Amino acid sequence: MSANIDDVPIEVSKVFDTILVLDFGSQYSHLITRRLREFNVYAEMLPCTQKIAELSWKPKGIILSGGPYSVYAEDAPHVDHDIFKLGVPILGICYGMQELAWINGKGVARGDKREYGPATLNVEDPECALFKGVDHSQVWMSHGDKLHALPTGFKVVATSDNSPFCGISNESEHIYGIQFHPEVTHTVQGKKLLKNFAVDICQAKTNWSMENFIDTEIARIKKLVGPTAEVIGAVSGGVDSTVGAKIMKEAIGDRFHAIYVDNGVMRKNETESVKKTLDEGLGINLTVVDAGDLFLGRLKGVTDPEKKRKIIGNTFIHVFEEEAAKIKPRDGSEIEYLLQGTLYPDVIESISFKGPSQTIKTHHNVGGLLEDMKLKLIEPLRELFKDEVRHLGELLGVPEDLVWRHPFPGPGLAIRVLGEVTKEQVKIAREADAIFIEEIKKAGLYRQISQAFAALLPVKSVGVMGDQRTYEQVIALRAIETLDFMTADWFIFEAAFLKKVASRIVNEVDGVARVTYDITSKPPATVEWE
């Protein structure tokens, strides 16, 4: 797919056939967009309160998500009735189906019993377009309310033991409702059902791919930035900032300026790795700033994790602004844009009907730079999920080991050194972390683990080395498995592996007397210790 600059609109939803997901606050809403994209149909999520008249594009179809409310409650959210004037297919899921019935004036009420968990779907009308090729199978229920009457113009196409209206359809209007959640993996044929809706009923083209995205996004960036404006962006050595920087390089060449700030609390050999990958390997215009002493000086005596985060965030902005001011654009141009590696989950959280979630920890980003430097924001990855960013990185030639690198927090090792952050403490955490990651890679486990690291605890423990009593510090190892980082399970290593890692750390890292392994899931714990 080749994209002409003049023909490319700013919104991705104007480039690709798009299914609009209207979110009523379900914990599963984001999974609907993920499932649709898995079979190459572009989907975008907006809050259920979205005014259809304000859309600048027309969706190929609309999905109403589930939600934790009762449609008959006084404060229940309701969809803009103009969705029915678009003449596009509509699918209501759980609360979404009840919303369709409620709009049609038919009974929705509290069920005799709530239905949470697996249920058996009985397909009553296999000729229904939505259920084409879908057999009697397990589905996932999560509801307390249910339909008590069939809306006018609809017929029953599926049932379950507790839901006589488990699936309803108005074939002439292409409007469908299902009481279960096809977006979760527990619904065995859920993906098939969603594909029936998006591809067969809505006739959406299956042209959403990273190959096509590259062409259209590069053209979009060129159109947005223009022929002379320049862009700056912070890079960290992580996958998001590297992929973002690479696509900017492909779009505008050396008019993109990447700034890497070494804050003194990075991973082992991080700065050298960033130079080698971005500057030498990917040809990105890179400025490296050694500000470790400044950051560590400002962190002196600070033990509170929130204060650490804020000090690092504010110091980063200060250093970044100073370095950006030194960049001298070519004649006739000026720096107008700031690159930020926003991903689609960040967008979803900000636009969800439920609103942004409660802040558990302050997130380290460059948002403050926009106001201070009077820059416009450019976010080339804002439509992508993490797995899509990784695929994009591979297509752009970003090295595989970087594309699949584990996440690293913005405040770096400062929040993995519990207590005061000093050069000596950082060195201990850094060396222990490097050994842990090295052994994980040797064991072929790195891609199976979502994130792994070593944290230095603010306690000391008695030990024996040689014939001498020691009283030194404790390292806690953490490794987790997760799909979305909203919940996570601890990774189960073989005992021999942990024994080897612990032995290496105690023997090779000065100042460590004991190694522990964190077996706490999220929740109740967070991934990081601070």
From Swiss-Prot:
The active site is at 94 (nucleophile), 181, 183. Disulfide bonds: none annotated. Pathway: Purine metabolism; GMP biosynthesis; GMP from XMP (L-Gln route): step 1/1. The keyword Transmembrane helix does not apply. PROSITE patterns: GATASE_TYPE_1, GMPS_ATP_PPASE. Its cofactor is Mg(2+). Residues 208-405 form the GMPS ATP-PPase domain. Residues 18-207 form the Glutamine amidotransferase type-1 domain. InterPro entries: Class_I_gatase-like, GATASE, GMP_synth_C, GMP_synth_GATase, GMP_synthase, GMPS_ATP_PPase_dom, NAD/GMP_synthase, Rossmann-like_a/b/a_fold. Keywords: ATP-binding, Cytoplasm, Glutamine amidotransferase, GMP biosynthesis, Ligase, Magnesium, Nucleotide-binding, Purine biosynthesis. One of its GO terms (molecular function) is GMP synthase (glutamine-hydrolyzing) activity. It is an enzyme of class 6 (ligase). Catalyzes the conversion of xanthine monophosphate (XMP) to GMP in the presence of glutamine and ATP through an adenyl-XMP intermediate. This is GMP synthase [glutamine-hydrolyzing]. It comes from Candida albicans (strain SC5314 / ATCC MYA-2876). The gene is GUA1.
